[in-house]
Amino acid sequence: MNNTKKRGVLLVNLGTPEEATAPAVKRFLSQFLHDQRVVDMTRWLWCPILHGIILPIRSPKVAKLYQTVWMKEGSPLMVYSKRQQVELQAKLNCPVEIGMTYGTPSVLDGVNKLQAQGVDEICVLPLYPQYSGTTTGAAYDALAHALRKVAVVPSIQFIRDYHDHPLYIKALAESVRQSWQAQGKGDYLLCSYHGIPQRYADNGDIYPLHCEMTTELLRLELGLDKSQIGTTYQSRFGREEWLQPYTDKTLESLPAKGIKSLDVITPAFSVDCLETLEEISEQGQESFLHAGGEQYRFIPCLNDAPSHIEMMARLVTER
């Protein structure tokens, strides 16, 4: 009996609107914000707020923000994800597909494409270095839901996190050093991670522990003093308390502490997207300079950098 399995890789990320238009953004946000992993409020209370207030108000505003970062080929998140797919497939010499937790292509789309190529063992790599139920947990839910719809369930290897993987830390450090070499070194390196409600962490989500560990390992790799680097959390919405310190408040306060030249990196994001290109690169710079800062350097995500592709390949082949 031939037990040789054909292996493939499914890269999972959050997803993106298909167009930078209010209707497309509304469809995407509706699916995203309906997930109880993301917003755990009681449905009968949350759904009227979501559909009656949030989606009608936020969708046009967010669409305009997307328009400022939209690339010729499409959404930055999708453009860079496809580049990762191509590069990783070439490196591993095996089928690699993309599946988004929300929007298209879905996780089911990715599984179907892999199985159509004869794959019967799938390594699922959610591109969230630090585990959170709101991201990696939601990706696992999407995978489980997708597998309910396939006739033959493939063997699955699921990579939960890689926040402390040596090649991930080295890839981050390389991107920082490249920025220093090209633009100069700032007084301080700010590591901005996507936030989650503080209540989620209080209830056991290990995300902030992973974020803090990533920052510490990056500090050691770069040889920085603890006074030269810090962790903050961005992208909060609503009135609930989220993980602190907040990125936006920190950017406003650093110049008064004597930090006039700042480098900012977003380690939780594997590809550049609205939250990095608009919120951090554009809004963040405006806030820092307005508060008295003089130099602001945004360090892009790892995207399809060779060191990032090498790390992804190692994660897959280690399993």
From Swiss-Prot:
Gene Ontology MF: a single term: ferrochelatase activity
UniProt catalytic activity: heme b + 2 H(+) = protoporphyrin IX + Fe(2+)
Class of the enzyme per the UniProt entry, highest EC level: lyase
Pathway given in the UniProt record: Porphyrin-containing compound metabolism; protoheme biosynthesis; protoheme from protoporphyrin-IX: step 1/1
Lyase in keyword set: yes
CDD domains named among the record's database cross-references: Ferrochelatase_C, Ferrochelatase_N
Protein EC: 4.98.1.1
Record: residues binding Fe cation: 194, 275
UniProtKB keywords: Cytoplasm, Heme biosynthesis, Iron, Lyase, Metal-binding, Porphyrin biosynthesis
InterPro entries: Ferrochelatase, Ferrochelatase_AS, Ferrochelatase_C, Ferrochelatase_N
GO cellular component: cytoplasm
Stated role: Catalyzes the ferrous insertion into protoporphyrin IX.
HAMAP family in UniProt: Ferrochelatase
Family to which this protein belongs: Belongs to the ferrochelatase family.
Protein name per Swiss-Prot or TrEMBL: Ferrochelatase
Organism phylogeny: Bacteria, Pseudomonadati, Pseudomonadota, Gammaproteobacteria, Vibrionales
